[in-house]
UniProtKB/Swiss-Prot annotation:
Keywords: Cytoplasm, Methylation, Protein biosynthesis. GO terms for cellular component: cytoplasm. This is Peptide chain release factor 1. NCBIfam families: prfA, PRK00591.1. Peptide chain release factor 1 directs the termination of translation in response to the peptide chain termination codons UAG and UAA. Pfam families: PCRF, RF-1. The gene is prfA. SMART domains: PCRF. HAMAP family: Rel_fac_1. The keyword Cytoplasm applies. The keyword Cytoplasm applies. Belongs to the prokaryotic/mitochondrial release factor family.
Length: 359
């Protein structure tokens, strides 16, 4: 087949896809739910590659036929350039699909929002960010669960932990879209507590982790854990549960603390807290093992300081600016209502270009 796609790469994919198809058709596989999920997820990841390859093969066959016809009848010659362009476009698309990618792109995520400098205004902005991600998830049919939240006096979030899951096995999951959101987000607006109408600057931080499919994928020694239980609390710290159902898990070797209080029972809260802990430990282990991953993660929140910003939300000018790529748009209300695709597409494009340049 003409084009730049490496034959060995696509041959490997074809063989893997055929093998997965056989596995998934075997009823015995589904006796092991974890293995079935992994096979299904990988099968879904390969689906766009297989579809693009089929289109490319069909277009190449059409091109070969058109060239043969044009050799005998010049009236067919006009079709050749069009088909050549189609083959080149599909070949490039297939090459992009076969390029090295983030192994977590199909994963769900744990997302944390933390208020920073700015007191109540920062907490209110943190809740605006959390709502932005919830609305974005809803637009994509994803499932969102607020695992834990500490609410400020005015109803903002001092901190909140969200679990965001995609609607099924997909090549590009939640992580592929939201992985660039980690960092310090700065807001410029007139706070509700400001009586003089002056614009203030405050900040909130976002941390995001790919969530392992199974807690067992991450090695966690029970003796390294301190588990505390307490009553779930509502707005302003008021108790909303008469039993000690909320769970706080401290991983003693790293000092990582995870809390969960939104499930119905202590057992459910512990299970969800363990999932969050596994995600954070997995991220920490990958940082330690991979210098590139470490450098990237350092761009997330170290200290929620207004000077370390990835993005600014300017209310007086209705403008959002992503400082990493120079992206600007004047639709702040829409962005905060979850219309993030244009921005996330631009960030993804910049990341792909950087990866290709580094090869």
């Amino acid at each position: 087949m003409a084009g730049t796609t490496q034959p060995s790469a696509i041959d490997d994919i074809l063989a893997e896809h055929a093998g997965l198809e056989q596995q998934l058709a075997d009823p015995a596989l589904h006796n092991d739910p974890s293995a079935a999920r992994k096979a299904g997820k990988r099968f879904a990841e390969l689906a766009p590659i297989m579809a693009t390859y089929a289109k490319l093969k069909s277009a190449q066959d059409d091109l070969d036929a058109a060239r043969e016809l044009a050799a005998d009848d010049s009236s067919f010659a006009a079709e050749v350039p069009e088909l050549e362009a189609q083959v080149l476009e599909l070949d490039k698309a297939l090459t992009d699909l076969l390029a090295p990618r983030d192994p977590h792109d199909g994963d769900d995520v744990v997302l944390e929002v933390k208020s920073g400098e700015g007191g109540e205004e920062s907490a209110l902005f943190a809740s605006d960010l959390a709502r932005m991600y919830v609305r974005y998830a809803e637009r994509h049919g994803w499932r969102v669960e607020i695992l834990d939240a500490t609410v400020s006096d005015l109803g903002g979030y001092k901190d909140a932990t969200l679990s965001i899951k995609s609607k099924g096995d997909v090549r590009d999951g939640v992580w592929a879209r939201l992985k660039f959101e980690g960092g310090v987000h700065r807001v410029q607006r007139v706070p509700v507590t400001e009586s003089q109408g002056r614009v203030h600057t405050s900040a909130a931080g976002v941390l995001i982790y790919p969530e392992p499919e199974e807690v067992e994928e991450v090695q966690i020694d029970e003796t390294d854990l301190r588990i505390d239980v307490y009553r779930s609390s509502g707005k302003g710290g008021q108790g909303v549960n008469t039993t000690d159902s909320a769970v706080r898990i401290t991983h003693l070797p790293t000092g990582i603390v995870v809390t969960c209080q939104n499930e119905r029972s202590q057992l459910q809260n512990k299970a969800r807290a363990m999932q969050v802990l596994a995600a954070r430990l997995q991220a920490a282990a990958e940082e330690a093992a991979d210098a590139e991953a470490s450098a990237g993660r350092q761009s997330q929140v170290r200290t929620v300081d207004r000077s370390e910003r990835i993005r600014t939300y300017n209310f007086p000018e209705n403008r959002i600016t992503d400082h990493r790529i120079g992206f600007k748009s004047h639709n702040l209300d829409a962005v905060l209502d979850g219309e993030l695709d244009a921005l996330l597409d631009a960030l993804g494009k910049s990341d792909r270009e950087a990866r290709l340049a580094a090869e």
